[in-house]
């Protein structure tokens, strides 16, 4: 195995977020309010199963322990179960997770688990069906809730739920969310609304700091948990009276980037060192054949030397991220 991926600031990278499509069937207000529109940036289409196998094999050789499949909506790919199985072939990958809108969860989650999926994140921005419809553009609240139940029935011990925190939309609904997770092993993760190139107006209207929720959780006796090396960026809190947990993802907080442990590859095979970086490094020409793995690993390692110490969101610089469906949020 090659040496562990480490950048110029001594950060080690154990976690790959791999987008497999930028297509999504939801129209979330903070991501794709006008729905998915093909970009026309490639004539080769999205990464194939073989290309996904090769890129994850290279990252595993460089010390990656966790792969999260993202989109767009990953489950819209007809070969999604085959993709999970391809990643699972590598024993060095200890965790394979997916971030999904839950649209196909009830129908397919048992098959995903059988293929090797170990973790699920479901996007749920409101527990009110009408508000859920207003945010997502889809009247699928009950279907998504049934999907979460199906995940537990399929054998997942915990489900993570992602909730984008928005002022005057859901920031005042903490008690409703807490009641929901009191007897369910759900890690509910509130994610601060992030500014993107297409979402500046929405950001100015609805952004609120997660500090507000953190202060309230601590006041109520919630306890901050230690972070593991392949965990995502959430600050996780638990409470003895709750089966569930609360996570807070606050990218505008000081030192947020100090614990960065993840890299991103887009659905067309570009490596991104940061969600809000300025550009990507093409890997696809080195995904055509198994004999290219050494060159692929070298390109990844060299690219990492250019990773910046921090993002520049505080300067309203969102890089190339026009919306979060492009490189998987």
From Swiss-Prot:
GO annotation terms (biological process): Mo-molybdopterin cofactor biosynthetic process
Uppermost EC category: lyase
Cofactor(s) named in the record: [4Fe-4S] cluster
Domain (Radical SAM core) ranges: 8-234
GO MF annotations in UniProt: 4 iron, 4 sulfur cluster binding; cyclic pyranopterin monophosphate synthase activity; GTP 3',8'-cyclase activity; GTP binding; metal ion binding; S-adenosyl-L-methionine binding
Binding-site residues, S-adenosyl-L-methionine: 30, 72, 123, 194
Pfam families associated with the record: Fer4_12 (PF13353), Mob_synth_C (PF06463), Radical_SAM (PF04055)
UniProt xrefs under CDD domains: Radical_SAM, Twitch_MoaA
Cofactor note: Binds 2 [4Fe-4S] clusters. Binds 1 [4Fe-4S] cluster coordinated with 3 cysteines and an exchangeable S-adenosyl-L-methionine and 1 [4Fe-4S] cluster coordinated with 3 cysteines and the GTP-derived substrate.
Reactions the enzyme catalyzes: GTP + AH2 + S-adenosyl-L-methionine = (8S)-3',8-cyclo-7,8-dihydroguanosine 5'-triphosphate + 5'-deoxyadenosine + L-methionine + A + H(+)
Binding site for [4Fe-4S] cluster 2: 257, 260, 274
Pathway noted in the entry: Cofactor biosynthesis; molybdopterin biosynthesis
Record-listed [4Fe-4S] cluster 1 binding positions: 24, 28, 31
UniProt keyword list: 4Fe-4S, GTP-binding, Iron, Iron-sulfur, Lyase, Metal-binding, Molybdenum cofactor biosynthesis, Nucleotide-binding, S-adenosyl-L-methionine
Family under the similarity heading: Belongs to the radical SAM superfamily. MoaA family.
Record note on quaternary structure: Monomer and homodimer.
NCBIfam families associated with the record: moaA
Biological role: Catalyzes the cyclization of GTP to (8S)-3',8-cyclo-7,8-dihydroguanosine 5'-triphosphate.
Record-given protein name: GTP 3',8-cyclase
